[in-house]
């Protein structure tokens, strides 16, 4: 076999290997870049912890917004805010840390920022997606799906999912609400922040991407 043929064979094998690795990575789902925790209270009762994985490779701007609001590094954010809208067999919504009723909140980029992309779809329960008031009106409000919500595809930006604590999400989903879907007893994000790799290792290990 000539040197030219050997070189050609080597390049072909290398391209095939790289393609296989790319397809394998893609088939596992979007990459989780950061892990965020919410510690939830309702009244004086601790409901537990929710751990989210953020898809910072697919929607970096949206994921960064959520991360910085969770850490409060800019002097404002999710800590102390409530889940103001809860609809059984649909979703739970929070993130309005200014008005606490769905009319407020702001992003780290200003009041609102555009839809980043709609590459990810609402295919399973436990997805983290941006609430909005129409196209390109993302702020700080988000929701967590409790069922498949495919009718939201192309309208709301999915940017993460629940890794641990779906039982806590279910507790919130089932809480009694008034006619405006607001919980009768406030459901509060008592604490939140960024998890280190060591602290979140188990969450990643058990995640279904």
Swiss-Prot record:
Activity regulation text: Inhibited by cyclosporin A (CsA).
Glycosylated residues (UniProt): 138
GO molecular function, one term: cyclosporin A binding
Keyword Isomerase set for record: yes
Annotated signal peptide: 1-25
Entry GO CC: endoplasmic reticulum lumen; fungal-type vacuole
PROSITE patterns cross-referenced by the UniProt entry: CSA_PPIASE_1, CSA_PPIASE_2
UniProt keyword Glycosyltransferase, yes or no: no
Enzyme class: isomerase
Substrates-to-products reaction catalysed: [protein]-peptidylproline (omega=180) = [protein]-peptidylproline (omega=0)
Residues spanned by motif Prevents secretion from ER: 206-209
Enzyme Commission number: 5.2.1.8
Keywords: Endoplasmic reticulum, Glycoprotein, Isomerase, Rotamase, Signal
GO BP of this protein: protein folding
Function: PPIases accelerate the folding of proteins. It catalyzes the cis-trans isomerization of proline imidic peptide bonds in oligopeptides.
Protein name: Peptidyl-prolyl cis-trans isomerase B2
Organism expressing this protein natively: Rhizopus delemar (strain RA 99-880 / ATCC MYA-4621 / FGSC 9543 / NRRL 43880) (Mucormycosis agent)
Higher taxonomy: Eukaryota, Fungi, Fungi incertae sedis, Mucoromycota, Mucoromycotina
